[in-house]
């Protein structure tokens, strides 16, 4: 089980990402136009003024059950440990143990 503060920190990041998504997208949209170097620097400064945790690349995928960040399967939203347990208990429909 992940520490509770790590899970809460991740929730806070997700809120910031959603809050600043449109603003960040607008600023980046103006950056793509043909601008002078000085104008590009000003736009970069605007981006840097936004909170650091509002950028999507700082988001970390976490298991919804345990909060574990490593060994994460996107399709299920679970870590490998929980995925294995749930699949053995037939709690995930359509998932079965491989045999070849």
From Swiss-Prot:
The keyword RNA-binding applies. Keywords: Chloroplast, Plastid, Ribonucleoprotein, Ribosomal protein, RNA-binding, rRNA-binding. It is found in: Plastid, Chloroplast. One of its GO terms (biological process) is translation. GO terms for cellular component: chloroplast; small ribosomal subunit. Pfam families: Ribosomal_S14 (PF00253). One of its GO terms (molecular function) is structural constituent of ribosome. InterPro entries: Ribosomal_uS14, Ribosomal_uS14_bac/plastid, Ribosomal_uS14_CS. Part of the 30S ribosomal subunit. NCBIfam families: PRK08881.1. Binds 16S rRNA, required for the assembly of 30S particles. Belongs to the universal ribosomal protein uS14 family. PANTHER family: 30S RIBOSOMAL PROTEIN S14 (PTHR19836), SMALL RIBOSOMAL SUBUNIT PROTEIN US14M (PTHR19836:SF19). This is Small ribosomal subunit protein uS14c. It comes from Gracilaria tenuistipitata var. liui. The gene is rps14.
């Amino acid at each position: 089980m992940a520490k509770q503060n790590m899970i809460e920190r991740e929730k806070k990041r997700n809120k910031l990402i959603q809050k600043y998504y449109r603003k960040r997208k607008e600023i980046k949209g103006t950056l793509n136009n043909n601008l002078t170097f000085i104008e590009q620097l000003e736009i970069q400064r605007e981006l840097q003024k936004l909170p650091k945790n509002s950028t999507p690349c700082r988001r970390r995928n976490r298991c919804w059950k345990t909060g574990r960040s490593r060994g994460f399967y996107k399709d299920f939203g679970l870590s490998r440990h929980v995925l294995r347990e749930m699949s053995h208990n037939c709690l995930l429909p359509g998932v079965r143990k491989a045999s070849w």
